[in-house]
Regions:
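Active-site neighborhood of phospho(di)ester-bond hydrolases with catalytic His/Asp-centered motifs
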Residues: 24, 44-49, 73-78, 108-113, ...
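C-terminal regulatory/interaction regions
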Residues: 129, 172-309
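Gly/Ser/Thr-rich loops at beta-strand to alpha-helix junctions
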Residues: 25-29, 51, 113-120, 140-142, ...
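Hard-cation-handling environments
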Residues: 82, 86-221, 282
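A polyampholytic, Gly/Pro-enriched intrinsically disordered region
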Residues: 21-24, 41, 155-165, 275-281
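Short acidic-hydrophobic, aromatic-tinged amphipathic segments that line or gate anion-handling sites
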Residues: 2-8, 165-169, 298-300
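His/Asp/Glu-rich metal-coordinating catalytic cores
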Residues: 1-118, 122-128, 133, 150-156
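Short, conserved active-site loop motifs that form the nucleotide-linked donor/cofactor pocket
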Residues: 3, 17, 70, 163-164, ...
């Protein structure tokens, strides 16, 4: 039980070490970077970050506040090998969804990570502008309802009447066996049935997961609809069931995605603006790409220690 709840910019003291969490832009909700002060040294650990999401201003704010004061930055480099002049923002994603499906006939299915809250907000905004119904499963509904206590997030409720919940048998059975029936019942007022989806399929945007495909496949009339894939393309290679589902139901396959991580251009800009004395790249398959910053880059192996002087 020895834990502390993080609050943005509230310092945490661990002996003589001070850690200040700063909210930062990332696809996961409530992401933080950490400013660490110890033995007179100042270290910034970025965590996973970007600036092209709905909270991009948070990342820009950090560079303004902490620049010129960093002895070392521990920085992620997931996309350091991706050099893009222009990167999709979440606002672009929202507009692209509208452009691709506004004149389509048939159901619209979209696959993404259920904890990619920025993306769900983009989908909700697009769905609302098209006056369509957004359908989510019980798992996603519970995540949204929980997080709505901490931020202005759309969730199945009387405040967001165009969000409905599909009660898939597989997940409902699992929750009942685990004694979590309340996680199902609290969304009863916002339930949408398979029959209602069939009747209104032209007006539906449904968030789906691989575990739902078998049940979704039993909905009448989903053939020739649209399937938007809003995830990292690398997952597709292992998604045999999904590829078979798409072929079986003759769904139009559309990719609309942007990464939860900063690209090469922004990583370079970020480092130049905070101007650290030392750069320690992590979370990357291409640490050598950081060598452009010269002698102050330290590429470390696992378990290797370094002294910041």
């Amino acid at each position: 039980n020895n834990y502390q709840i993080l609050k943005a910019e509230n310092p945490i003291l661990i002996g003589s070490i001070k850690v200040i969490p700063f909210l930062i832009d990332h696809s996961a909700f409530d992401s933080y970077c950490f400013f660490i002060e110890a033995d007179g040294k100042k270290i910034l650990y970025t965590g996973d970050f970007r600036n092209h999401g709905r909270k991009g201003k948070l990342t820009d704010k950090i560079t303004g506040r902490l620049s010129k004061h960093i002895d070392a930055v521990i920085i992620e480099g997931t996309n350091i090998n991706r050099i893009q002049e222009k990167i999709n923002t979440e606002e672009n994603i929202e507009n692209e969804i509208i452009e691709k499906v506004k004149n389509k006939i048939g159901i619209n299915l979209i696959m993404l990570g259920s904890q990619n809250i920025d993306r769900i907000v983009s989908i909700y905004k697009a769905t609302s502008k098209m006056k369509k119904i957004l359908v989510v499963d019980i798992y996603t509904a519970n995540i949204l309802a929980t997080l709505s206590k901490y931020a202005k997030i759309p969730y199945p409720s009387s405040n967001f009447k165009n969000i409905k919940v599909i009660f898939t048998q597989k997940l409902c059975r699992k929750l009942e066996l685990e004694g979590k029936k309340d996680n199902i019942l609290k969304f009863s007022k916002f339930k949408i049935t398979k029959e209602e989806i069939e009747t209104n399929k032209d007006n539906i945007m449904m968030i789906v997961k691989n575990s739902m495909l078998e049940e979704i496949g039993n909905i009448k009339g989903i053939e020739n609809g649209t399937f938007i894939y809003s995830m990292w393309e690398g997952y597709l290679e292992k998604s045999t069931a999904l590829l078979q589902f798409l072929e079986r139901h003759k769904l139009e396959f559309i990719k609309i995605h942007t990464s939860g991580h900063a690209n090469n251009n922004f990583i370079m800009k970020f480092i130049k603006e905070i101007n650290p004395k030392m750069i320690i790249p992590i979370h990357t398959n291409y640490p050598e790409k950081f060598e452009m910053f010269g002698k102050n880059v330290k590429v470390l192996n696992d378990n290797q220690e370094i002294e910041i002087v």
